[in-house]
Amino acid sequence: MPLCPLLLLALGLRLTGTLNSNDPNVCTFWESFTTTTKESHLRPFSLLPAESCHRPWEDPHTCAQPTVVYRTVYRQVVKMDSRPRLQCCRGYYESRGACVPLCAQECVHGRCVAPNQCQCAPGWRGGDCSSECAPGMWGPQCDKFCHCGNNSSCDPKSGTCFCPSGLQPPNCLQPCPAGHYGPACQFDCQCYGASCDPQDGACFCPPGRAGPSCNVPCSQGTDGFFCPRTYPCQNGGVPQGSQGSCSCPPGWMGVICSLPCPEGFHGPNCTQECRCHNGGLCDRFTGQCHCAPGYIGDRCQEECPVGRFGQDCAETCDCAPGARCFPANGACLCEHGFTGDRCTERLCPDGRYGLSCQEPCTCDPEHSLSCHPMHGECSCQPGWAGLHCNESCPQDTHGPGCQEHCLCLHGGLCLADSGLCRCAPGYTGPHCANLCPPDTYGINCSSRCSCENAIACSPIDGTCICKEGWQRGNCSVPCPLGTWGFNCNASCQCAHDGVCSPQTGACTCTPGWHGAHCQLPCPKGQFGEGCASVCDCDHSDGCDPVHGQCRCQAGWMGTRCHLPCPEGFWGANCSNTCTCKNGGTCVSENGNCVCAPGFRGPSCQRPCPPGRYGKRCVQCKCNNNHSSCHPSDGTCSCLAGWTGPDCSEACPPGHWGLKCSQLCQCHHGGTCHPQDGSCICTPGWTGPNCLEGCPPRMFGVNCSQLCQCDLGEMCHPETGACVCPPGHSGADCKMGSQESFTIMPTSPVTHNSLGAVIGIAVLGTLVVALIALFIGYRQWQKGKEHEHLAVAYSTGRLDGSDYVMPDVSPSYSHYYSNPSYHTLSQCSPNPPPPNKVPGSQLFVSSQAPERPSRAHGRENHVTLPADWKHRREPHERGASHLDRSYSCSYSHRNGPGPFCHKGPISEEGLGASVMSLSSENPYATIRDLPSLPGEPRESGYVEMKGPPSVSPPRQSLHLRDRQQRQLQPQRDSGTYEQPSPLSHNEESLGSTPPLPPGLPPGHYDSPKNSHIPGHYDLPPVRHPPSPPSRRQDR
């Protein structure tokens, strides 16, 4: 199984069990959620004084006024809150309620003991325990030798040498350079300049020095240096036992405690494992975790709470509401639609919102702050509410969302936007509870008394006593410039045209200066009188210290440098003109072009290539053969006849044109072209809407074929089959006959669907019975009369066709198992008249004179038209009747003469299978016909080029009437004609009147489906039965 799905499964699935914050490797993070809570806030109420002023001469300032008190009330609010959640620390995943280490590579033959650290089973090596190479070998086939010196091992996959302590990588051939030791020679010798053992760092002290670090001097003696006894343990290690081994203090390990603890371990001899998570570092001496920014806790397992970030979570986030602050560095993660360092800038221009900023905001522009750049929700100005910020706050409420309450006394009105009271004249204060201060009067105490420099002023008429610095009786004239004080006798000491106060002599500096004597210029960022004004510039390099005019940066303009350059301009003071084409905009700071969707290039001068669109000219999703793609938004414009999101769907039947919006106007089964709506008519119809039938002597598709009838007779408008006059036959009516026959179509007979259902049920029962009696019936036919009237079905020769059915010898009865041709058996000699005529049968009428006496009976041939077939029209015919009526006459030397019968052809009378007429295999070869005695044998093969048409034939009324007149008997012919039962009552579909005496019932040998598709054999001759009583039982 691939490793990636295993990792995802390990990280994503939570098995049974619950994490505990005290469990190892469990960390805490904070998640935000929405909650409804009860919030307290202060609401003002007024308390009237116990006594009020009623004496008009009293100073109103000395009277007690109503006092305002605040009481705590509660309201329900919806706000965002956060809560801690437990999860496995980085490098671990949850399994059965515990956090187990996770290895990025599967430990094939081992187990994961720490994050990305495998403990291999015996005999296996490598980071993932998948190699069984012997020591000193590596590679996928373990056929490469490790090129590592000093018997060093190598990685079984990469061949990288694992150099032991004291040898230099990469090949472990050289010892550590002087002054270095340990693994990879990463530590410096601690021997006061002396060399050390490259493996464990033991010092090689020079003469005169001793100690584990050569830090103990030896005394000089007569016999050399005398050195005190020392132990090799470094870094405070304590010797143990007689072997000189050392017990290392916390943070050190090795034989002489010269190696610091490796990462992840601490304590004495580095035996304790660190438990610091989320990138925290462990102090190798104490094991205390030094957490990375964004995490706290004794194991660095807790993420900074919401709103805090940085080292030890000491910093406060400064992100806009709705944005999230990253705990590590405090960067703001903006919600959709906002950008900027604090997520305060909208991505969409003012007044627009949506994914492409294409939707206009519906907020009242005067009373709304903005609309949300993604979903368009209006942010109302304080004092306004409603979906579109067009509803003012109710009385005594104000603020954002009208959530705050206000209280205004003495007839004051509350301003819905700020909650400030608009007090009645003479009152002031947050709740209009106080009189105007001395020397003021009027609405909001904005008017001063007429002697505004008086010691005292009436709030009504402004009467006053002059103060220092003023002169004349009404205290309206100040001291002259340069003087101040009582009687204006002191001189001012103000520089840079500063003016001193006539009362105190304090200097009022001109804009741009400050100080006791106006001798100092304004500090940077301040301007104006007394440098009291702060520069109000958004994107500037400071402002003018005198009048505060902002010095705008490139790309900005306006009094506060708060307006970006207008469209089409950029640079300092927006003095440069953009050169972007095709609707592109330029960056106001540097003039770079930002192209509109559908264009590209440095100046947006090039459109997207065909088949691409949008800002990045991405691939269109339209079907290139049936549509075009809008270069801006990729919208597919379908060509006529196509529809769908990508124009890959053709118009549904009955529709055409652009967007398939036009309805087809084709009749009689015609279809219309999906692009231009032109009608494609069925054979036999023409005209723009297929409403016109074919003109005389024309037939076929669009009536483009000429009838091939030799005598100028009419032909079928769909198939072109000729309707021959009496005495002629053949596909083109060229064949004459001694005995002429006319086969006339009759009108279809209608019946209700219930009759069709009953007929089908009866037919099914009869078919089962007939199959059981079939073998006996064949034997019963043998030895009967050999004289039959053969009626051969042949297709009429159409324009361009190459086949015709030859006449059939009268001496034989044949049937051909062919889907387009069928042969009727000849009538038998005159038997006794039956008592009952079975079913609807096929009869052939004859009005020709009798044959010579040597003949046993009449030899008649009839060629049926090509449109003889099984047809159905639900509103006219049932499901089991053929739609032609034919007549048959028979004469015998002993009989009374020919008879004529008409009747509808049904599948019971014909014995024909519907499948033989509507078979999907229209091709067959009819083999040789039996030759007559004394006549040369002729072979006839007919290859069928197509199945019979399924369209109902159409005949003009005059042609049908003429055919019916031709079938009327002559008074002198001796022919008896029995009228069709359908001529007077079309509802009697299945009934036939009794036959005249001496006329046998019609017989039709139906074809059976051949076992070889497309090729049919000639079955044995079948003779009609002679006993009439048995014929009636069929």
Swiss-Prot record:
The modification Phosphoserine is found at S951, S1026. Disulfide bonds join C27-C89, C53-C63, C88-C99, C185-C196, C189-C203, C205-C214, C233-C246, C248-C257, C270-C282, C276-C289, C291-C300, C313-C325, C319-C332, C334-C343, C402-C414, C408-C421, C423-C432, C488-C500, C494-C507, C509-C518, C578-C586, C580-C593, C595-C604, C617-C629, C622-C636, C638-C647, C660-C672, C666-C679, C681-C690. It comes from Mus musculus (Mouse). This is Platelet endothelial aggregation receptor 1. One of its GO terms (molecular function) is signaling receptor activity. The chain crosses the membrane at residues 755-775. Phosphorylated in the intracellular domain on tyrosine residues. Phosphorylated on tyrosine residues by SRC. Tyrosine phosphorylation is detected upon platelet aggregation stimulated by collagen, TRAP and thrombin and platelet-platelet contacts but not after platelet activation. Tyrosine phosphorylation enhanced its association with SHC1 and SHC2. Phosphorylated in the intracellular domain on tyrosine residues. Phosphorylated when in the presence of SVEP1. Residues 19-754 are extracellular. Pfam families: EGF_laminin, EGF_PEAR1L. Glycans are attached at N150, N269, N474. Interacts with SHC2 upon its aggregation-induced tyrosine phosphorylation. Interacts (via extracellular domain) with SVEP1. Residues 1-18 form the signal peptide. The keyword Disulfide bond applies. It is found in: Cell membrane; Cell projection, Lamellipodium. Residues 181-215, 223-258, 266-301, 309-344, 398-433, 484-519, 575-605, 613-648, 656-691 form the EGF-like domain. One of its GO terms (cellular component) is lamellipodium. Expressed in thymocytes, bone marrow stromal and osteogenic cells (at protein level). Strongly expressed in kidney and heart. Moderately expressed in lung, spleen, thymus, liver, brain, testis, skin and stomach. Expressed in hematopoietic stem progenitor cells. Its main location: membrane. Residues 972-991 have a biased composition (Polar residues). It comes from the Eukaryota. Residues 776-1034 are cytoplasmic.
